[in-house]
Amino acid sequence: MGDEEAPSGSIEDRINHKNWKWRVSGLEELTTKFRNSIEGSGPLFNEWGPQFKKILADINPMSQERALEPLSAFIDRCDCVNKFAASYVGVLVEKLFASTRPRAKEKTIECLLLTIEADSAEPVVEALLKGTSSTSPKILLASLAALTQALKTFGPKQIPVKLILKQFSPWFENRDKGIRDQASELFIEIYRWIGKALIPLISEALTPIQLKALQDQFEKLPTDPAVPLKYTRSEAAKALANASKGIQAKPEVVEEIDPYSLMTAVNILPKLTSEFYEGLQAKKWQERSEQMDKLVTILTNTPKIETADFSELCKALKKILADVNVMIVQKAVVSIGLLADSLRGGFTSYVKPFITPILEKFKEKKTSVLQSVHTTMDSLVGKSISLSDIIDELTATMQSKVPQIKQEVLVFICNSITNTKKPADITKVTKQLTKIFMEALNDTDSNIRDNASKAFAALGGIIGERAMTPYLNQIDPIKAKKIKDNMPAVATPVTITPQPLAPVDLKDIDLPVSSSNKKPAAATGNSKSSSTTTPTGRSSNSSPLPPPPSSSDDIKNKLIGAGIVNNEIIEGLGKTQWKDRLQAVDDILENVKGLTADSINGMSESIIQLLCDKPSLKESNFQVLSSIFSIFIQCCKNDSNFTQQRCANSYLTTCIEKLTDVKLKEISSELLFSTGESITPHAVFTSIYQFTSNHKNPKIIADSLVWIQQAIDEFGIGCCSNGIQQLKPLLDYTKQCLESTNPDVKKSAIKLLCTIKINIGATLTDFLGDVKKPTMEVLDREFQKIRDQKPPVPNRQWKGMPPPGSAPVQIEFPRVDISVKLTPAIITNLSDANWKTRSDALDEIERIIIDANRKIQPKLGGLIPALKNRLTDNNQKCTITTLNIIGMLSQAMGGQSFEKHARLLIPGILLLLGDSKKPVRDAVISCMNVIVQSDLGFDVFIGSLAAPMIQESAFTRKESLAWTIVNVTNMKAAPIPSEINTLAKGIISCLQDKSAEIRSLADNLLSILCTQIPLIEFKKELKHVKPASQPSIQTILDKYYQKTGQPIPPPSKTKQSTSSSSSSSSTTSQQSSTPSSPQPIRQQQQQQQQQPTQPQQQQQQQQRRSILQSNNGASNCEFIIFDINGKMNRQKTNQIPSWHFIEPTEEVVEILQDQVLQCFTEEFANLMFSSLPSNSQHMSDLMIGMIEQNPEAIISVLDILFRWITFKLFDTGLASQKRVLKILEILLNKLIDSEYSIGEYEASCLVPILLEKSGSATNEQIKQIFKQSIQQLEELCLPNVLFRFAIEMVTSQNWRTRVEVLNVMASIIDKNGASVCGNLKVVIPLITQNLNDSQSKQSSLLCLNKLYSHIKDECFKYSNISQQDKILIIGNNNNNNNNNNNNNNNNNNNNVQQQQQQQQQQQQQQPRKSLSTDEMSTQLIGCLELLKNYSITKENIEHTVEALKQFSGLMANGKLDDVFVNFAEEYFLVLTSILADTFPQVSKDATILRLCKYLIHTIISILSNKVVAKQCNVRCLEIVLNETIKLYSLAESNSSKQGTESELSKAFNQILLRILQNCNSTILFSTLLQMMSRTDNDQSIQHPGKYNDLLLRCLLRATKSLTTPSILEELNVETVLSEINSFLKSNPSLDEITRKTTKTLTSELYQNRTNQVVKFTKDIISKGQQQKYQYLLNLLIELVPKQFEDLINGNGNGNRISSGGSNNNNNNGGRVSSGGNNNNNSGRENINNININSSLDSPINDHHNSNNTTTTTTRSRTSTGSSNSQQQQLPTTSANTTTTTTTTTTTGKTQSTLSTLKINKEPRDYSGKTDSQKKELLIEIFKKIGNKDLTLDGIHDLYFFIREYPDYDITPNLNSSSQQFQAYITRNLKKIKDSMDAPKDKDDEVVNYQERLKVIQNTFYNQHNQPSSQVVNNNNNNNNNNNNNNNNNINNNNNNNNNSGGNENIAPQLSNTASMASNTLQRLRTLNPDQNSGSNNNNSHQNSPSTSSSNDLNSTVASLRQRLAQLTSKSNE
């Protein structure tokens, strides 16, 4: 062959290639691509990032190791490693650490360290900690090494030590010394960082030796503080920023680990018994002291106590504090301190009552007591409460007259202040403490004064010297000096610098603005000229309108001339028939729509006057009036001269009034909107005020308020707030409506005020001061609900509206002083160590600004410095929130006020441009844009922009350059040269960057700023550039500057171009013409640079979303935001269990709108919520088109679409409901066609409200549509899901809804059976409640009737139903049955014969049977579907249990047997799968245990049905056997098996027994053999050894049953033999046990079906299939002697088939002799006495199974006589038998033999017993049966007892044993009865004696411990000797007997017995040589007994009887 093909193709193909060399080639190229990548993100990284998990899992070690190289390059270049780290770090730990490659471990650790450096430490630490718990020593050792290296490199800030300390104990207990040493190295590294704090954390878990060894290593460590060897990327960027500012890096502060957090809480209350509390109340102090000692001991030994109710203990301790015995009091104080240490925060609520009593104990003289009190108080204040919590108690105690108390309290306060970790708690009570100290300083006791000075000094260390000055000035100078002297000596753990009072600045005061400083009115859009314009919005110089026509004739003539009307139309307007009027109006509408804009100008007034005359606005027909309104709408939209006075006033009042008309509401609303667009909305509002203010119809007022609210949303608040003068009438009108008594009016007014509040903010409250207090409280609650809402974007405009570019018109609200709300606590919390506290403080500040309506005074106190510190916060959320607050402040304060703060904050903001997290950079850009858009403009940034450009960070440079290019044009004034010249340094630095993109951006910025920055500034910076880079930069400078230093003027002829884009020279000239506002030259390039700053998700959404086209355009655009996982994510985060409400609230609408915007484009979402009919119809058309064209997209948003449909069902408009229901109908039909199944979550979004609305619908057409939709849902939803939602609605307040729901439930039950109902105990009472309601009673009866038809009288058990109702329920059921069964007897004539009547009856029964079969199938399918949708939730478990109950009830009816067979496989599959899923949790949840029991019971009940079991196929049995044996193995393998698992093990055993007993034997053997063939390849088997053992036991048990005639009849021997051959073929190398089991099965088949086996074998040979059945033939040849081959070769009856080398002749057919024994076989054909040993389980051992030992016994076969012969049991004593027997265990054989020897078959005398004696006797009998050595003897006792007392009930005694053992007892009783009742034959004694001889032989050979070979040799020798002497005589005798007839068959048996006796006697002599002389028959081998010598036989038998008695007694001993 030639050389291997060189790798080629794409990287993807090579990496996925099967050849590892190709994969390595692909990995090398991928590494190169990563290293050459300039970008840190993009398609390359997004494509390959997720694939490293698969690449690293390569099975080839070489390829796997080489995969680390591209991973290393990927991590080095990628900016978003944290997005992919979690996917590959686990593979690194699991696969690469276990690699066999020498350097794989080191490279893997390098990759993990690189990942941590890329700010992705969390997944790495998690994976490594998981690796430390691995069972593989290699992975464990490498994980520990990686943790050590990571901690050493990055420190505990990135590698949390706390997580390591939670699981370190097993490392030091590992047997591998390397692991223990590596763990020691890890802890040495931890000690480097946290020092001695580590020792108490590990002292309890380590042995003293290990701890001592570690401490020795700790002492050797250097004392220098540990520092990380590397920074992460984010830390490096901050360090670089600090370095550029000259800020020194601070040493890393290691988080202090509290050992308390690692401890396990213990509940101590159970230890405090009632004796403890009684002892505390004892009179003797010794008893009280003893109990307190006990409490102290418990608390001392419990460092962490579980939180519980300690109120009783605290009450007892409080009483003890008042005890007279000081020592007991001291112990109580100590106990309280220990409780505080152990409970900490959990003890806070109990502390207060103890404070004063404990403080009073400071008066005690004993030092130990004082020390205990101090310790306890320190514990209370440090662990449970703060000093500020007990300041009142301290103040009261300081009023004590005992000096010692004051002195000690001051010492305690000083210690608390000095040791505090929360200075803020001290600052809260500064005033109270200073008051205490100043009083104590004046005390007469010097010790009190000294302690007060120290405490005062400690307080000064907290609040600072400046804050102390006011207090010190009030004190005597000498005392003040003493305090100052003590202050430096006091430790100040935390220093808080008080904020100095800022000097008063005029800029901080709001002054009235003089008129000279105001901007021109034209600029604001609020000039007086605008307020004096005409209402039409036209300017004063516009041409006046022509005068209107004066008469109606002129109007008609004018309109006829314009072609709008004709005489026919005018005549039609006045006709009495509404259809004629409607036709005329529709003609006018068509003509108006056809007019152009120029044609309709000036015609609107005439049209309106014509229609107002005829048919007039009082038209009674709504269709005519609707068309008139449509004409008015066209006039409003198309006539530019439309005015209010001449046009709108004619119809406005009528239009407002028609808002209440359901049929005209939509068109009236649309007309008002169109009118507002033509004449300002404010004019429409004014008309509403005037018309509705005093109107008597409250509905008109309410609907008008609703329309105003919609108008504000669609036009914006500007439509009514051009000044406070226009807003005030609206507010006055709304407040007037608030006083209305009508709830609808009041509710609408509140909603309108909420809308205004959303738009204008908190200032609205200023206008509501005169509102009544109760109403105001309601408003406040509503305002609280909408506080986070933002005003919607206006989508309508009116004529005269300010252009979009102009400044929005706003109401000037007063600025709010928020300095009062910015409390010191909030400012302090901004610096808290806990990020959540900081985040909460920032959120509170943001809330304060929002509540102030973003109009605040520039009085911020210490907020700005605190915000500056938060810009460098480690938490991303805090940083983003800080940036948002800064942007809000710039807008809320105004540009001039915020300027000084901006210059302080901007440097920190710009540094964040280099943050590696995209959200942070986006927030920075957004904040900067907001600042620029304020009055400050770009100017405030100029002096700070150079800093981010100088940094060596690609992010910082790119973002700062791109932003500067875009915003440099927003400068408000000419830049200051000193500031803008600083950009020269930044531009020069960026021109040297390695990134071409950054250099291009810098070039672009230089082209803009070349006119602002002189060349000399660039020359200065060029000197610091490397000489190699200077020429390229100089070339760029030469492009924009002349040699004289002046900038080159922009070219006017040519176009300047760049590598990416170009712009025209004319544009450049125009842009550069104004130096104060320079424009960028490369606009396209700027746009490209802006794109990376936008969030990537937004870009993708913009690409996916397409703007909806107008009504006149195409409508087939995509409007669904397709997300394949969106529905799943919404289901997980769903917070509303059931989408059901009586009326949609604001919260519901808000939730729905947010969800719709997530799934649909914004334009389409607006259409979905539009109230205009045109928009709604357009939306409906688009939706229906999408449903037809792209159902997949619709299904992805099906839940939200269902919710929107239900929301729209609440519309009052009939047309709107029809549109929505049409969408629903089409949607459901499409889902049915697609065979889609609606899940429970999707159904919850639709079904509840649909059911509710189906009852409330009044329109018949709508009601029918609802019913049709529910029928469609019955096809789409699972019946139990639909039923569950229906049962929830059955309690509805609307009786119509209840009726519809009950009908739906009846339909579901009728179609699917009662199993869909779930828990009948809950369902039936809910249904029966409606029996008391007259409206819903009929439906309730129908539902109960359907239920009764399935479960009969069971439905009456769960509720009290009256007898009358029961009759109705049952009667309805009977009527239904009678209606279904048509009786045709009335059609028969009297002369019809009886035979014809019977035929007719048979014909009538046929359809009934088929119907019954269909019903049963439906019921079974219903139960099956319920089980298939099982999931492990409590509710579903109950449904499943109920379904199983229903199924068991169905199976109890024997009619289902034949039908169930068709579903058996599916049922078994579902039942076993549920059982397998739930079994692992059975010990954790009682509900799951209950479910498992029902499942097992169901399976057993199925298999107990013999009709079903016999028809189960191989697949059914395989399903049940596989799962049952798996679970049985799992239960048995649990070493700590509990009662539950033991009980389930028995249940699994019952399943196996039912299969073995009831299933078809052929199918059973086929299944078992096939399963044994597949066992080795099944990876799902957890315990294969146990699994195989159980399979073999099942096969053995099935083999035993082959002696049963019924099983033999159904057995197909050919099939079983074929399966045996297949099994042997697929498993050529079997273990000994399996092979022996296979032999046993084959031998049993041969013994019981010899003819069929022989025939099958002959057929194989005749067909030439020996090769195919080679394995079976080999087994038969092995089992059967060599003569078997002669038989199957066709030798016939004349052949001799012998074994063991004996030569025997048979003249009467073929005879078989084995081992020297010759038996006559006249009853079987050919061959039947070849004895083959089989290993079978003893039934006694099955019951007494203590060691699961399988006992091998020798079974003798029975032979059947030809005509008059009887069954005989033949002995088997061949060498083969002996060999097989000796291979079994001695213990099992001995037990079986002893139990056989102890059987007493003699009759018992149990007559004359009393009842009590009978009971006792029966107990003793069953005890004997329970003894495995006396079982059979006990069964004989039981037989004679039953024969004596046949009427006595022994069932209770039988039930005490297992079902298996009961069956065993029953079988043996039957055998005993049969044997007793059978006639006694002459050969019984011989046969029985023969059996006894066999038992004795086998027993004693085993007892004498002879080797197997010796036993076999002895047997063979003895048998050969005896048989050689006796064969001739026996053969001759046999020949004679064969000719004499069947009555002389005893002779051969006597001969055989004599031979056996001789053999036995010889063996006994061998075993007992000392007794040979005493035996009368010691030479029996010389004189063998003959059949003709009865004397010799008798003497031999007598001798053996005597010997038998001796040996029996010996064996018993």
From Swiss-Prot:
Biased composition (Basic and acidic residues): 1799-1809
Biased composition range(s): Low complexity: 524-543, 1053-1106, 1372-1406, 1695-1735, 1746-1796, 1913-1939, 1967-1995
Compartment(s): Cytoplasm, Cytoskeleton, Microtubule organizing center, Centrosome; Cytoplasm, Cytoskeleton; Chromosome, Centromere, Kinetochore
GO biological process: one example: microtubule cytoskeleton organization
UniProt keywords, alphabetically: Cell cycle, Cell division, Centromere, Chromosome, Cytoplasm, Cytoskeleton, Kinetochore, Microtubule, Mitosis, Repeat
Traits of the deletion mutant: Mutants exhibit a disappearance of supernumerary centrosomes and multinuclear cells, and increased sensitivity to the microtubule depolymerizing drug nocodazole. Mutants overexpressing mtaA exhibit supernumerary centrosomes and a cytokinesis defect. Mutants underexpressing mtaA display inhibited growth and a reduction in the number and length of astral microtubes.
Keyword Repeat recorded: yes
Entry's transmembrane regions: none
Pfam families associated with the record: CEP104-like_TOG, XMAP215_CLASP_TOG
Any one GO molecular-function label of the UniProt entry: microtubule plus end polymerase
GO cellular component: cell cortex; centrosome; endocytic vesicle; kinetochore; microtubule; spindle pole
Gene3D superfamilies, per database record: Leucine-rich Repeat Variant (1.25.10.10)
HEAT repeat copies, ranges: 115-153, 158-196, 200-238, 348-386, 427-465, 724-762, 816-854, 857-895, 899-937, 977-1015, 1240-1279, 1281-1314, 1317-1353
Bias (Polar residues) ranges: 1940-1949
Self-association state and partner proteins as the record states: Interacts with eb1 at the microtubule tip, centrosome and kinetochore. Interacts with lis1 in the cortical attachment of microtubules.
Family, per entry: Belongs to the TOG/XMAP215 family.
Function: Involved in regulation of microtubule dynamics. Regulates the interaction of microtubules tips with the centrosome and cell cortex.
Protein name as it appears in the record: Centrosomal protein 224
